Regions:
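Gram-negative/organellar outer-membrane beta-barrel architecture
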Residues: 1-131, 219-221, 233-241, 255-259
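C-terminal/domain-terminus segments
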Residues: 256-277
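Feature marks short, surface-exposed loop/turn motifs that line or immediately flank catalytic pockets
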Residues: 46-48, 94-96, 151-153, 202-206, ...
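C-terminal outer-membrane beta-barrel translocator/porin domains of Gram-negative envelope proteins
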Residues: 112, 119-252, 257-262
Length: 278
C-alpha cells in the first residue's frame, strides 16, 4: 500500500481452497469545496463451489461450479455532510461460469457447460453510516441505496459442443437493478441491544433458457460470511426481500454475545428442468 497525502494505491491478493483473486486499487482526493475523490479499481478472481461442502480441505471433491470475475471500474464520490457520501461509477466486466447441470453425474466423464457475460455497467450509490463498529456494531444505523444499469452480451456453450454438437446460444442483455440495505440498533437498557436488518433487491433482468445458468449468476443473499463459500440455490434470486433481528448482550466494552435470525423471501420464477437436482 502507498499513501501520499491525497493519493492512495494498493495491491491485494487472496489465496484459498475455494477462492483466489487479486485487486489493484488507487484513489486520489480532489481539491474541491466539497470533499471528493476519484478512484480506479481492477479485479481478477476465481471461486469454486464443490459438490459437497466440507469444513476442511479435501482435493478429492469434484468442483461443481466455477465462477470467474474480471472487471475494471472508474468511480467518483463526494461527501454529503460528515456521515454520508454519494458515489457514481462506470465499469466493464468479463464474467465466466462453468457448471454441471446436475450433481448426480459422473464428474470424470462429463464436461461442464460454459457461459460468458461481457457487460458494461453504470452505478450510483448513496450511503449514510453512523455505526460504531464496521463488523460488530452495538449502536447507530447504516443505510445504503445502490442503483445499477447493465448492458452486454450473454453466450451459453453446452458441454455437448465438446462432442461435436454445435448449439451455442447468444443473447443481448439489458437490465436495471436497485438494492436497499438498512441496519439499525436500538438500545434496551445498559446491556441489551436489539439490531434490525432489511435487505431488498429488485431487478428487471430477464431469465435465459437455461435454469442452472440463471441460478449460478443470480445475486445471493449471504447472512453470514461463511455462506459466501458454498452454493445454495435457495438463497439466490434476481429479486428478494430479507429481514432479520440481531439481539445482543454487552458483557464489557470489548466483549459481547450476539446472535442473528432472518427470513428470506424470493421473487422470480425459474423453470427447473426435471433432471436437475440440488
Amino acid at each position: 500500500t502507498l499513501s501520499y497525502n491525497s493519493f492512495d494505491a494498493s495491491l491485494r491478493g487472496w489465496i484459498g481452497q475455494s477462492y483466489y483473486g487479486g485487486e489493484l486499487f488507487s484513489k486520489i482526493a480532489l481539491k474541491t469545496q466539497v470533499p471528493s475523490y476519484a478512484a480506479i479499481s481492477g479485479v481478477v478472481s476465481k471461486q469454486k463451489f464443490y459438490e459437497s461442502d466440507m469444513l476442511f480441505y479435501s482435493d478429492e471433491l469434484p468442483t461443481f461450479i466455477i465462477n470467474y470475475d474480471n472487471h475494471l471500474r472508474l468511480q467518483y464520490g463526494f461527501a454529503i455532510g460528515r456521515k454520508a457520501k454519494m458515489e457514481f461509477g462506470i465499469g466493464y466486466g468479463h464474467l465466466e461460469d462453468r457448471f454441471y447441470q446436475s450433481n448426480v453425474v459422473d464428474f470424470n466423464s462429463t464436461s461442464q457447460d460454459h457461459t460468458t457475460y461481457k457487460l458494461g455497467q453504470i452505478i450510483g450509490k448513496f450511503e449514510h453510516n453512523t455505526l460504531n463498529h464496521p463488523l460488530y456494531p452495538t449502536a447507530g444505523s447504516k443505510a445504503t441505496i445502490t442503483a445499477i444499469g447493465v448492458t452486454g452480451k450473454y453466450t451459453f456453450t453446452p458441454a455437448s459442443l465438446n462432442q461435436g454438437i454445435v448449439n451455442t446460444e447468444n443473447e443481448n442483455m439489458t437490465w436495471g437493478q436497485v438494492e436497499v440495505n438498512l441496519d439499525k440498533y436500538f438500545p434496551l437498557g445498559n446491556k441489551f441491544v436489539l439490531g434490525t436488518k432489511i435487505d431488498v433487491l429488485g431487478s428487471t433482468k430477464k431469465l435465459v433458457d437455461n435454469y442452472t445458468a440463471n441460478i449460478v449468476q443470480a445475486p445471493a443473499f449471504n447472512p453470514t460470511p461463511a455462506t459466501k463459500n458454498y452454493f445454495n440455490p435457495d438463497f439466490r434470486s434476481n429479486s428478494f426481500l430479507a429481514a432479520g433481528i440481531i439481539p445482543l448482550f454487552k458483557i464489557i466494552d470489548n466483549l459481547q454475545f450476539r446472535t442473528e435470525g432472518c427470513q428470506l423471501y424470493l421473487s422470480g420464477k425459474y423453470v427447473k428442468a426435471p433432471t436437475i437436482k440440488y
